[in-house]
């Protein structure tokens, strides 16, 4: 029983950190604002993740997500860029460009 608890803890920790590995573009959202999300297809050369509040509330808490949608760029576990929608529930128009610029800076 003790080993089972340890295994579950390790799996939880590893799945939590996996979405931050390498260069990762992570979008935090909810089903009712799907139309306000950005497409992550442009970033398919990197790790991309889309988390919904109804399914991954623990990630929202851990990353201190206040507004949805929010996009965070991670590099090897470190938060590089965080773009929030604010009370409008709309991400800024230059969100994709800002992410691309930050990725280019990481790669240079």
Residue ranges and their predicted role:
Residues 1-9:
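Sec-dependent signal peptide recognition
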Residues 8-17:
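Hydrophobic h-region of N-terminal signal peptides that target proteins for export
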Residues 18-49:
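Local sequence-structure signature of Cys/Sec-based thiol-disulfide redox active-site neighborhoods
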Residues 31-34, 58, 79-80, 89:
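Solvent-exposed loop/turn segments at secondary-structure junctions
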Residues 53-59:
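N-terminal post-signal-peptidase region of extra-cytosolic proteins
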Residues 59-62, 83:
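Short, charged, surface-exposed secondary-structure boundary motifs
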Residues 63-75:
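Structural micro-motif
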Residues 73-108:
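Non-catalytic, surface beta->alpha helical segment in thiol-disulfide oxidoreductase systems
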């Amino acid at each position: 029983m003790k080993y089972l608890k340890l295994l579950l803890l390790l799996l939880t920790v590893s799945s939590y950190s996996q979405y931050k590995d390498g260069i990762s573009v992570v979008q935090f959202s909810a089903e009712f604002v799907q139309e306000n999300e950005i497409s992550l297809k442009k970033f398919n050369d990197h790790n991309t993740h889309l988390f919904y509040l109804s399914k991954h509330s623990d990630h929202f808490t851990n990353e201190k997500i206040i507004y949805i949608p929010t996009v965070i760029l991670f590099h090897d576990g470190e938060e590089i860029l965080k773009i929030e929608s604010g009370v409008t529930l709309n991400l800024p128009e230059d969100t994709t460009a800002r992410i691309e610029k930050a990725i280019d800076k990481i790669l240079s």
